[in-house]
């Protein structure tokens, strides 16, 4: 009678306030970032646990489980048996977990025996199976049930990539029968009042309760092996304690215990070809409560085609690499700690698992169908596993490519990391468990049932070999992960370079805008200076006009000229002011655009800095991981060196044994040396031939090494022939029985020698493989460390460049602000200057109006005095008084102007605009209209003024005509000069064109000469190369001819030697033994030829190994140099970061308020 008792974590524990949700580490490895917990959605697709981790869990569970785990909870099961009845039955879900893969048949047998030993034996009843009730799965368990469909679809995709690296597990997997798909548990879920998860059923439902039936012992054994799943191990190893807010504190115990009894002992069970399949299949863990549902058998169909994909030997499961998982943005620090805890599996936690057992939130009834009985074979599994282990040998690293070596290196690194974590866990297990943990695990009384356990351990060498083969399959994706990491880093570098280009473009644009603004300012300054010069010229012309002899004509002409000039100047000033306003508006719009672009640049710099900070954190984490890997790899390399020393000692022992065997062979051959007197003639002939060979070897020094080898072979052949001759003589004299015995002994010795040579070669290969693997591990770890250092240096350089650019942007900001201030100041100065000019022009217009009034008054006085001559006004009569009066007027005007200026300066008049009513034009007009009111006879004065103006107009027309004539003469002279200049320029251009044509001709001639020289040089080089090639070929031909002659001579000598030897043997031997002697000679010749071929192959291999060693040394020197450079660069980067940090600390307090600077300081600190 056997019973199954399970205490369940009914619902997933809710997290406490301020603490993250606890979850098992390997379950977190299974989940992808997309598969987030959501009660309102269906289960998302997740990645499966790696087969290697599954095997580690099973192995450590089998090794670390104690009998107390199964005894402590027996009474608790009985106390809770009828606590929570089930109310509602839901659809049944049938789904199978991915099959855990075993290392070998021996490993599967070991697991089976260990799990069977944990059961309680009760020989009275062997068929009664108690029913059990299941609680609903947590979200991680439900997602584990979703894996099988995804694994079946991805098995064929991954099979092609995994077939290349299949090792010992493939051979084991081929012996394993396909798993039975339908021999699974049926889970009948009872719906609670408030369900936590609403997932659709994954398989057909069956709510019928089967009756109790007899279960054979073989099925019980297979079922017990099938119950061991990775999630069950996690449930045993990790327990969670927390209190939900607003609810009671409930004890939750995650501990799975099984108690079974069957009549047969584990030693009597013999597993056949289908046993590994039954052992390898793992079903999702059951979370049981006390409510019981009866269980009955169900017929299990045979294996189908779909089961072929579940063979344990094939690595068809998908998994997520740690680096890709880290790149998805998971909290790496917590996950790494959980991963270390998951790989430790301490037995203390298994013995004292403390948790919270929830009350009856929901319950699930199940009808369990045990698997169909499997055929039991009589094959010896241990002999089969030993045969498989001896048949699978490690590959020769000399024949592998660089890619394969890198994959092997990555596999070994991960294996070393996992083994190091396991060693740490096993060391921690030796310590005494905590008293609270021991006390908290005792919820039930211990049962008196005795449990026996017979663990078996493989040898260390076999375990290491199996672990290496497993690591080869586990770590195939690390090469791809490193390539993805490098591609990501290259993409980040390209993004940074693009950012650099954009920043440089923006800076160039800002510089062009600043240069355009400076040009506009320079143009405005030039215009202002031209206006000043024009004002001075106008003043000078006015003074010259006032000093003229003809007062009236000169004044009118000067007035007209001055008025026209001033009007044109004012119009030009208006146009220039309008242009200036347009330019100012354009500059303002450009400044607004610059401001917006500057804001965008600031946002981009912030985003880039945040991205770089994230990249820096990820790189630091990766750096820590790699450092840990390197430390563990060094420790394991020390262990490997110790093992290699042991292997060398074993090899020395084998060599000593070989020497003993050689001594025995010498002893056997010593008693055959009595008959050497009969072959003294052959020795004399041999000495003569050796003398001839030595003479020819002195002549042919170039082939001395080859002739030495031929001599040694010849001497060996002579010795062998002598031995054989002696044997033949003895055979003729002695009986045939002695000959047969001698041949048997010789064959045995050859066999022993061959075996010793094979063992020696295998040992040498293994030692070389171990050395090469250790060296490759060291080199690749150094290369990875250097690459990480280079990446860090590049990222730091990009950070420095971004900081420099941010500083440049700040300086550009300051320059823009200064330019704005300069623009404002220039605008204010320009406005002030314009106001001053308008004020001066208004004063000048007032003075001109006063002068006109004085002229009119003077003319009226003259007209009153000369009433008789009022009809005709000659220009000569008015010229004399006009010359005297302007001088007085000039003096009076010059005296009045400062007083007027003094009177008008202190008045705070408002600033007049150009187009307003208070401008200079309106003031002049108002004065001219207001002045006649003071005169009594306005009409008379107007008439007189009109007549005077007409006369002045006539005089002005005459003057204009004379001026036009003078200007025409000047223009004609200018035209003639222009024509002369054009003719001279044309002549000069023609001369220049002729010179340019000559220069082009000369350049073309020079180009032709250069081309000819290059062609001649190329022809000479080709001829030299041809001559050198011909010389080399001729030298090679001479060497080949010499070699051919030497070879022909050696062949002839060998033929003569063989003929002489055959004749000597024929003369010495009887006619009955001649056929045997000839056959024996032919065999010896054939063997000598094969020996020569093998020696040549050995020399070639030796040269290849030397070349490989040279390459290895060169690569090692290069890598050491790169490491040194990376260390120096890292030091420089650290110094620069420290300097930047110090400079940022020395920034004044006004700049410290900037958020970006604060963020940089926090990041650097």
Swiss-Prot record:
Residues 509-856, 937-1146 form a coiled coil. This is Sperm-associated antigen 5. The modification Phosphoserine is found at residues 12, 14, 66, 161, 321, 333, 342, 946. One of its GO terms (biological process) is positive regulation of intracellular transport. The gene is Spag5. Essential component of the mitotic spindle required for normal chromosome segregation and progression into anaphase. Required for chromosome alignment, normal timing of sister chromatid segregation, and maintenance of spindle pole architecture. In complex with SKAP, promotes stable microtubule-kinetochore attachments. May contribute to the regulation of separase activity. May regulate AURKA localization to mitotic spindle, but not to centrosomes and CCNB1 localization to both mitotic spindle and centrosomes. Involved in centriole duplication. Homodimer, with a globular head domain and a long stalk. Homooligomer; the globular head domains associate, resulting in aster-like structures. Binds to microtubules in the mitotic spindle. Interacts with DCLRE1B/Apollo. Part of an astrin (SPAG5)-kinastrin (SKAP) complex containing KNSTRN, SPAG5, PLK1, DYNLL1 and SGO2A. Interacts with KNSTRN. Interacts with RPTOR; this interaction competes with RPTOR binding to MTOR, resulting in decreased mTORC1 formation. Interacts with G3BP1. The complex formed with G3BP1 and RPTOR is increased by oxidative stress. Interacts with OSBPL8, PCM1 and CDK5RAP2. It comes from Mus musculus. Residues 453-821 are annotated as: Interaction with KNSTRN.
């Amino acid at each position: 009678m056997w019973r199954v008792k399970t205490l369940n974590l009914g619902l997933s524990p809710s997290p406490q306030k301020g603490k993250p949700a606890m979850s098992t580490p390997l379950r977190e490895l299974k989940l992808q970032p997309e598969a987030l917990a959501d009660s309102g959605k269906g289960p998302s697709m997740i990645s499966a646990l790696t087969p290697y981790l599954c095997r580690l869990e099973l192995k450590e569970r089998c090794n670390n489980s104690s009998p107390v785990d199964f005894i402590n909870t027996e009474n608790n099961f009985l106390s809770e048996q009828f606590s929570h009845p089930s109310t509602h039955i839901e659809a049944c879900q049938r789904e199978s977990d991915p099959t855990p893969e075993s290392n070998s048949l021996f490993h599967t047998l070991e697991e089976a025996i260990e799990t069977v030993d944990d059961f309680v034996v009760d020989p009275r009843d062997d068929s009664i199976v108690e029913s059990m009730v299941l609680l609903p799965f947590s979200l991680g368990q439900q997602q584990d049930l979703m894996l099988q469909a995804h694994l079946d679809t991805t098995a064929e995709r991954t099979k092609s990539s995994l077939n290349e690296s299949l090792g010992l597990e493939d051979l084991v997997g081929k012996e394993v029968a396909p798993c039975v798909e339908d021999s699974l548990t049926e889970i009948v879920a009872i719906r609670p009042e408030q369900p936590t998860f609403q997932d659709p059923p994954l398989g057909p439902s069956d709510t019928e309760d089967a009756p109790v039936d007899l279960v054979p012992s073989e099925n019980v054994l297979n079922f017990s092996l099938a119950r061991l799943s990775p999630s069950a191990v996690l449930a045993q190893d990790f327990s969670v304690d927390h209190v939900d807010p607003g609810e009671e504190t409930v004890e939750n115990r995650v501990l799975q215990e099984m108690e079974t009894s069957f009549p047969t002992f584990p030693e009597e069970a013999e597993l056949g070809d289908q046993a590994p399949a039954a052992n390898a299949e793992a079903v999702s863990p059951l979370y049981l409560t006390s409510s019981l549902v009866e269980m009955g058998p169900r017929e299990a169909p045979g294996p189908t085609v779909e089961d072929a994909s579940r063979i344990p030997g094939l690595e068809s499961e998908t998994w997520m690499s740690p680096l890709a998982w880290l790149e998805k943005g998971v909290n790496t620090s917590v996950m790494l700690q959980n991963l270390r805890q998951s790989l430790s599996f301490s037995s203390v936690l298994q013995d004292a698992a403390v948790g919270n057992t929830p009350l009856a939130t929901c319950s699930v009834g199940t009808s369990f169908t045990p698997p169909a009985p499997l055929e039991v074979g009589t094959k010896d599994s241990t002999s089969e596993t030993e045969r498989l282990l001896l048949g699978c040998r490690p590959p020769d690293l000399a024949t592998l490519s660089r890619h394969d070596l890198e994959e092997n290196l990555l596999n070994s690194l991960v294996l070393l990391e996992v083994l190091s974590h396991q060693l740490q866990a096993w060391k921690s297990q030796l310590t005494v468990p905590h008293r609270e943990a021991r006390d908290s695990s005792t919820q039930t009384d211990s049962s008196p049932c005795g449990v026996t356990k017979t663990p078996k351990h493989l040898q260390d060498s076999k375990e290491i070999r199996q672990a290496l083969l497993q690591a080869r399959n586990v770590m195939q994706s690390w090469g791809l992960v490193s390539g993805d990491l490098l591609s990501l880093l290259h993409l980040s570098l390209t993004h940074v370079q693009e950012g650099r280009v954009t920043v440089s473009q923006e800076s160039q644009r800002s510089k062009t805008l600043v240069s355009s603004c400076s040009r506009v300012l320079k143009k405005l300054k030039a215009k202002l200076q031209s206006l000043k010069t024009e004002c001075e010229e106008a003043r000078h012309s006015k003074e010259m006009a006032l000093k003229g002899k003809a007062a009236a004509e000169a004044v009118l002409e000067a007035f007209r000229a001055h008025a026209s000039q001033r009007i044109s100047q004012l119009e030009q000033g208006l146009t220039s002011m309008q242009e200036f306003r347009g330019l100012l508006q354009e500059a303002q719009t450009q400044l607004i655009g610059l401001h917006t672009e500057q804001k965008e640049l600031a946002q981009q710099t912030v985003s880039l800095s945040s991205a770089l900070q994230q990249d820096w954190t990820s790189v630091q984490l990766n750096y820590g991981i790699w450092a840990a890997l390197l430390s563990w790899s060094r420790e394991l390399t020390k262990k490997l060196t110790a093992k290699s020393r042991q292997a060398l000692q074993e090899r020395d022992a084998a060599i000593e044994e070989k020497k003993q065997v050689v001594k025995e062979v010498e002893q056997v051959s010593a008693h055959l040396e009595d008959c050497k007197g009969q072959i003294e003639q052959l020795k004399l002939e041999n000495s003569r031939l050796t003398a001839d060979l030595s003479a020819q070897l002195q002549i042919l020094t170039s082939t001395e090494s080859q002739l030495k080898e031929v001599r040694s072979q010849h001497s060996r052949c002579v010795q062998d022939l002598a031995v054989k001759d002696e044997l033949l003589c003895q055979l003729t004299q002695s009986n045939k029985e002695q000959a047969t015995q001698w041949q048997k002994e010789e064959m045995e010795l050859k066999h022993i020698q061959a075996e010793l040579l094979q063992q020696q070669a295998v040992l040498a290969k293994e030692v070389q493989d171990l050395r090469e693997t250790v060296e490759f591990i060291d080199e690749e770890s150094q290369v990875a460390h250097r690459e990480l250092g280079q990446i860090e240096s590049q990222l730091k350089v990009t950070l420095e460049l971004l900081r420099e650019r941010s500083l440049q942007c700040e300086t550009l900001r300051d320059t823009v602000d200064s330019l704005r201030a300069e623009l404002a100041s220039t605008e204010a100065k320009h406005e002030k200057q314009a106001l001053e000019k308008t004020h001066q022009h208004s004063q000048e217009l007032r003075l001109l109006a006063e002068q006109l009034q004085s002229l009119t008054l003077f003319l009226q006085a003259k007209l009153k005095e000369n009433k008789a001559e009022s009809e005709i006004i000659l220009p000569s009569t008015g010229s004399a008084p006009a010359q005297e009066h302007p001088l007085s007027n000039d003096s009076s005007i010059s005296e009045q102007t400062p007083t007027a200026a003094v009177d008008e300066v202190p008045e705070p008049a408002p600033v007049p605009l150009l187009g307003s009513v208070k401008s200079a034009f309106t003031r002049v007009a108002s004065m001219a209209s207001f002045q006649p009111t003071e005169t009594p006879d306005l009409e008379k004065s107007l008439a007189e003024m009109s007549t005077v103006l007409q006369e002045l107009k006539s005089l002005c027309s005459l003057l204009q005509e004379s001026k036009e004539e003078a200007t025409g003469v000047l223009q004609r002279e200018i035209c003639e000069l222009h024509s002369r200049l054009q003719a001279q320029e044309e002549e000069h251009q023609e001369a220049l064109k002729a010179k340019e044509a000559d220069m082009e001709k000369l350049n073309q001639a020079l180009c032709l000469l250069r081309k000819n020289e290059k062609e001649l040089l190329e022809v000479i080089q080709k001829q030299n190369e041809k001559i050198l090639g011909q010389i080399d070929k001729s030298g090679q031909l001479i060497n080949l001819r010499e070699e051919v002659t030497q070879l022909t001579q050696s062949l002839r000598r060998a033929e003569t030697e063989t003929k002489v030897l055959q004749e000597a043997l024929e003369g010495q031997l009887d006619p009955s033994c001649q056929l045997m002697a000839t056959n024996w000679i032919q065999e010896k010749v054939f063997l000598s030829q094969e020996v020569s071929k093998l020696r040549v192959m050995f020399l070639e291999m030796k040269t290849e190994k030397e070349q490989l060693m040279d390459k290895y040394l060169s690569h090692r020197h290069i890598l050491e140099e790169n490491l040194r450079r990376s260390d120096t660069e890292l030091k420089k980067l650290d110094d620069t970061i420290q300097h930047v940090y110090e400079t940022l600390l020395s920034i004044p307090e006004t700049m410290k308020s900037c958020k970006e600077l604060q963020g940089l300081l926090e990041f650097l600190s």
